[in-house]
From Swiss-Prot:
InterPro entries: PnbB (IPR032345). Lyase involved in the degradation of nitroaromatic compounds. Catalyzes the conversion of 4-hydroxylaminobenzoate to 3,4-dihydroxybenzoate (protocatechuate). This is 4-hydroxylaminobenzoate lyase. It comes from Nocardioides sp. (strain LMS-CY). It catalyses: 4-hydroxylaminobenzoate + H2O + H(+) = 3,4-dihydroxybenzoate + NH4(+). It is an enzyme of class 4 (lyase).
Length: 169
């Protein structure tokens, strides 16, 4: 059985490589090329976070019932180069929006689909597996369609803000 510490330990070498990089389009492309589906890191960490959701230690706090859950797995610390690690589970066939939020320092978001065709909206379109890397100061609704996904996100300094007003639609 895997544990949160297994996922944290697997993330340390990855975060060592990323500690001086900034979220955005260039990093998103690089993450998908170097660490996307099929890479050793992606497959290992995706397996661990899937185990965590199944076993109840990841994405286990309901935000909007059982279809939208999250949990912080690690606080920012020196060992993680001051990134936090959070898991989010979202499940909806029809497009579904979660809590509007802002990324003061950006976000590195590993998208793990649990159903074929499940996708998460990223800043550059829908992502069915791989990475999104919203820029610093970006803000959005997390949005899923096509089934269940896990979003495992790494936040510089653990910074995320839910204290922001969504734009008028």
């Amino acid at each position: 059985m895997s544990t949160p510490q297994d996922l944290i330990d697997a993330s340390i070498p990855f975060l060592n490589e990323l500690k001086n990089r900034t979220a955005g389009e260039d990093l998103e492309k690089w993450l998908n090329d170097a660490y996307g589906p099929g890479s050793e890191f992606y497959e290992r960490v995706a397996g661990l976070v899937k185990d965590g959701v199944r076993d109840g230690w990841a994405a286990n706090i309901e935000v909007d019932g059982p279809r939208y859950r999250r949990s912080r797995l690690a606080e920012p610390c020196e060992e993680l180069n001051y990134f936090s690690i959070t898991a989010v589970y979202m499940d909806s066939v029809e497009p579904y929006r979660g809590q509007y939020h802002q990324h003061p320092y950006g976000e590195l978001n590993m998208v793990v689909p649990l159903n074929e065709g499940a996708e998460l909206a990223g800043p550059r379109g829908w992502c069915g597996g791989g990475w999104t890397a919203p820029d610093p100061a970006s803000h959005h609704y997390p949005e899923v369609r096509g089934g269940a996904i896990i979003a495992l996100f790494y936040l510089p300094a653990g910074r995320i803000s839910y204290d922001i007003t969504p734009p008028a639609e």
